[in-house]
């Protein structure tokens, strides 16, 4: 994001432009059980999460450890469906206000979780429909877990020069003061780095410094951002390596394909399997896609061919990965899946990894 010089003329132009856009932009309709971005931020900033408001992340555990709203509890929808007692283990009083979230408005994991909780007697159950994208849109921090750091293929950012830090063979480390991060040294280290690279700022007990570093990284258009408390690290510390220009490439698991590969499959007319609910599919989907909601997959899997490549998508990657596993157990060896956020209007779809 290019920095703007806040000259009076530019401010006036920006204001007039934003006012004109506001007059024509569609208003997002709030649902009856929905918590808005501003309310969610207020709960966080006033320290209510975990005290008078309970926040539950309905995404798979692998997504949770990569970055979640601070104070959130992890309860994947799949686990909740398999083991109702998993809800009790969270220690949430049935009279308490509990809010579920996942990967944004296209993701229904949070909606389904809230519905289950209401049936279990939690009457004050809400949904933060904007989820992680909405939280990030408000420039709020996401907290990573140690398991994510140990998993590797990250870029760690430490703004405490000359101090021992988290040095591992599977991650890369940039150790610069905040001023250097904003300057030429930061540009040298990060200037050619993929904007999709996951960056984790090391928290040494100063959240103001963490937020300043995260803001600088947002200014540089990095979007996969989180922070991790050094106090939570159980490994050893070591001196940081010499500063170099960094590069990064994604590592895909079995069956997972890059967004570009998936888009090429759509363009080539390959068999695209959309496992979202029928109502979501009706609002928009990839051109030529076939809808078999994951809830119906066990009885309708025969609709899916075994003799041609099959590419699976959902809204966030959670259901598509599960579909890959289900079909694999049924003998399908021709399935690939997209683990990314997907948003569609009609047949116009965007993918955000």
Predicted regions and their residues:
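Rhodanese-like catalytic fold shared by cysteine-dependent sulfurtransferases
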Residues: 4, 20-42, 62-100, 104-271, ...
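Mature N-terminal segment immediately following signal peptide/propeptide cleavage
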Residues: 41-46, 53-62
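Bacterial N-terminal signal peptides
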Residues: 7-17
């Amino acid at each position: 994001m290019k920095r703007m010089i806040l000259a009076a003329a530019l401010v006036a132009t920006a204001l007039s432009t934003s006012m004109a856009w506001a007059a024509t932009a569609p208003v997002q309709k709030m649902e009856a059980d929905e918590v808005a971005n501003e309310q969610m931020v207020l709960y966080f900033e006033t320290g209510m999460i975990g005290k008078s408001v309970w926040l539950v992340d309905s995404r798979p555990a692998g997504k949770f450890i990569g970055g979640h709203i601070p104070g959130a509890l992890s309860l994947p929808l799949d686990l909740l469906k398999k083991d109702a007692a998993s809800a009790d283990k969270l220690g949430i009083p049935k009279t308490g206000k509990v809010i579920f979230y996942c990967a944004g408005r296209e993701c229904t994991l949070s909606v389904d979780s809230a519905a289950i909780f209401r049936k279990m007697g939690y009457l004050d159950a809400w949904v933060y429909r904007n989820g992680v994208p909405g939280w990030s849109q408000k420039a709020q921090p996401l907290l990573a877990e140690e398991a994510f750091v140990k998993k590797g293929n990250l870029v760690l950012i430490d703004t405490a020069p000359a101090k021992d830090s988290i040095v591992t063979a599977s991650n890369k480390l940039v150790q610069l003061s905040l001023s250097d991060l904003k300057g030429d040294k930061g540009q040298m280290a990060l200037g050619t780095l993929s904007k999709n690279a996951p960056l984790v700022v090391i928290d040494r007990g100063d959240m103001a410094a963490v937020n300043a570093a995260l803001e600088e990284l947002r200014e540089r258009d990095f979007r996969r951002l989180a922070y991790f408390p050094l106090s939570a690290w159980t490994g050893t510390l070591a001196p940081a390596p010499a500063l170099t220009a960094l590069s990064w490439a994604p590592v895909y698991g079995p069956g997972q394909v890059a967004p570009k590969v998936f888009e090429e499959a759509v363009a080539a007319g390959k068999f695209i399997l959309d496992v979202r609910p029928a109502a979501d599919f009706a609002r928009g989907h990839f051109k030529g896609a076939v809808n078999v909601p994951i809830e119906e997959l066990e009885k309708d899997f025969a609709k899916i061919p075994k003799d041609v490549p099959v590419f699976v998508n959902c809204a966030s990657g959670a259901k598509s990965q599960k579909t890959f596993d289900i079909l694999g157990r049924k003998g399908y060896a021709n399935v690939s899946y997209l683990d990314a956020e997907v948003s569609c209007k009609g047949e116009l779809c965007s993918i955000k990894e």
